[in-house]
Amino acid sequence: MSYQIAVLAGDGIGPEVMAEARKVLKAVEARFGLNIEYTEYDVGGIAIDNHGCPLPEATLKGCEAADAILFGSVGGPKWEKLPPNEQPERGALLPLRGHFELFCNLRPAKLHDGLEHMSPLRSDISARGFDVLCVRELTGGIYFGKPKGRQGEGESEEAFDTMRYSRREISRIARIAFEAARGRRKKVTSVDKANVLACSVLWRQVVEEVAVDFPDVELEHIYIDNATMQLLRRPDEFDVMLCSNLFGDILSDEIAMLTGSMGLLSSASMNSTGFGLFEPAGGSAPDIAGKGIANPIAQILSAALMLRHSLKQEEAASAIERAVTKALNSGYLTGELLSSDQRHKAKTTVQMGDFIADAVKAGV
């Protein structure tokens, strides 16, 4: 079977790490007999420079014709003074999410063996490790609710946002969380503020209704303020965390930083058909672009998420993840994962990609 992938490398380190993800995918194709065709499109700052807008029509049409989008990163100082809606991040990513109704965001975060020193957690806590999947509703809630705006003048001026969720929006994201938990440790922690917010009362009610269809999965509820604390005390006790848009925005970044490096974290944004946009959780890192030192693992793991969720190639996705684990366990690390006195051992972006691709070929 042939798959069509829209490749949007973007700005900063995007093209460098995307090249390594493509290298690893080539190894996957050879090992598993897959036929994946890639078409590159401009997005973000480079699209502004070449086409006058961050999301050209040709890019959007190319994404519409694809089975999935493999996204790099966008943005940088060069475009920061543009009007907000014309900047790379807001002018490209948000329209893509809206156009394809990418309502589900998956953010896995794992503390790998041997990298406990990277975590800001106390050593006795980090020694236990953790493996958490944050499932975030991405297109509803307070970020998109109407009315929204400002009114009045002087001391009477006020600003307002509306938090709004429908039963359908809650149910569909909850089902994804429970399905994900079935393939993991069979536990869902639903994050809300049901002691204060009407939206959260409905959220909790609908999640409990969905849970009836998943009797093999444990469900617990936790308030958002308590969740932020418990992630610092006992992250190893969480499996899948189900969150609304606002709460997921907060918690996914907290979970990410508990690993100690954004360079290891991937992200998937998907719609109800399984079509998705897969990207690193970090940014374009313009300060290190072109130096050959960027960590490509987040981009490579994004490719694994793409294989798993949009292309339904679980075996191939797992092969990439095992290869990444082998690299990390072998001490094959880029500079940001090493202490200052060990940075002379740092591997380059290309060396990391080579090692992981070779590990995939070897069938680790």
Swiss-Prot record:
The family database entries (Pfam families) matched by this protein are listed as: Iso_dh (PF00180)
Q: In terms of one coarse class, where is the protein primarily found? A: cytoplasm
Mention one GO molecular function.
magnesium ion binding
- Entry annotated with the keyword Lyase: no
Q: Does the keyword Repressor apply?
A: no
Choose any GO biological process term that the UniProt entry carries and state it.
Answer: L-leucine biosynthetic process
EC number assigned by the record: 1.1.1.85
- Its EC top class is oxidoreductase
**Which residues are involved in binding Mg(2+)?**
D225, D249, D253
Q: Which GO terms describe its cellular component?
A: cytosol
Instruction: Please state the pathway this protein functions in, per its UniProt record.
Output: Amino-acid biosynthesis; L-leucine biosynthesis; L-leucine from 3-methyl-2-oxobutanoate: step 3/4
Which SMART domains does the record associate with it? Iso_dh (SM01329)
Q: Where in the cell is it found?
A: Cytoplasm
Cofactor annotation: Mg(2+); Mn(2+)
- UniProt remark on cofactor binding: Binds 1 Mg(2+) or Mn(2+) ion per subunit.
UniProt similarity note:
Belongs to the isocitrate and isopropylmalate dehydrogenases family. LeuB type 1 subfamily.
Question: Which PANTHER family does this entry report, sorted A to Z?
Answer: 3-ISOPROPYLMALATE DEHYDROGENASE
Subunit structure, as described in the record: Homodimer.
Record function comment: Catalyzes the oxidation of 3-carboxy-2-hydroxy-4-methylpentanoate (3-isopropylmalate) to 3-carboxy-4-methyl-2-oxopentanoate. The product decarboxylates to 4-methyl-2 oxopentanoate.
This protein is called 3-isopropylmalate dehydrogenase
